[in-house]
Amino acid sequence: MASLEIIKLEWATPIFKVVEHSQDGLYILLQGQVSWQNSSQTYDLDEGNMLFLRRGSYAVRCGTKEPCQLLWIPLPGSFLSTFLHRFGSLLSEIRRDNSTPKPLLIFNISPILSQSIQNLCAILERSDFPSVLTQLRIEELLLLLAFSSQGTLFLSALRHLGNRPEERLQKFMEENYLQGWKLSKFAREFGMGLTTFKELFGTVYGISPRAWISERRILYAHQLLLNCKMSIVDIAMEAGFSSQSYFTQSYRRRFGCTPSQARLTKIATTG
């Protein structure tokens, strides 16, 4: 079983920044309040909450003056496949949900989950313990989530993660979303007919390809806007928008302000 690199993070970002994830995983909010956004929804994570998210890019903001502290637990495909195989008989008792998995799931931490997290943190502080103990604690955590009130949705998401065509699509889209292709070209380059491509895309992302591509480009442009000195028109072109005016409209619709206002806010915040 693959070794898992669990990371303790400290964030202090009062404005939305883009966080990219190449793996699926769990966030445990130890302190503070964090807002996560995808293309269709905002998720507010409070202290004492846990968040499961699928790989991809999200806009994230810390909602408190003090830095937020989080624990990030990556869940590689090989680890999840082993977990599902090892506990397949037990997990088969949970009702199946065949709907499209949600990209994010928030869990309230119950007393038993809290105890499990404390045990995991205690092991992480001991460098003399074998890594298998960490893996066992994570498996315990996953089982508790699977048998929680949202266990059906959680397990549905885990089962989809082991689907190879879906993993291949995610990798393909992350590598090519900036291409100026028509949708039929995306499907052809992926090796599918347009209808089949749309169906697979809906299963993986729960939204249309056009909506996902637009969201991904906006997040990429947002990252450029806040972290480099490129002009707004150059950022619009770099992110695949046909014009600066279209980019400005899309950005305002997504973040509630113009690109110029966002850049000024960034300057005022960071000094």
Curated annotation (Swiss-Prot):
InterPro entries: AraC_XylS_family_regulators, ExsA-like_N, Homeodomain-like_sf, HTH-like, HTH_AraC, HTH_AraC-typ_CS, Tscrpt_reg_AraC-type_HTH. SMART domains: HTH_ARAC. Transcriptional activator of the Yersinia virulence regulon. PROSITE patterns: HTH_ARAC_FAMILY_1 (PS00041), HTH_ARAC_FAMILY_2 (PS01124). It holds the Pfam family HTH_18. The keyword DNA-binding applies. It comes from Yersinia enterocolitica serotype O:8 / biotype 1B (strain NCTC 13174 / 8081). Keywords: Activator, DNA-binding, Plasmid, Transcription, Transcription regulation, Virulence. The lineage of its organism: Bacteria, Pseudomonadati, Pseudomonadota, Gammaproteobacteria, Enterobacterales. This is Virulence regulon transcriptional activator VirF. Residues 184-205, 232-255 bind DNA. GO terms for molecular function: DNA-binding transcription factor activity; sequence-specific DNA binding. Residues 167-265 form the HTH araC/xylS-type domain. The keyword Transcription regulation applies.
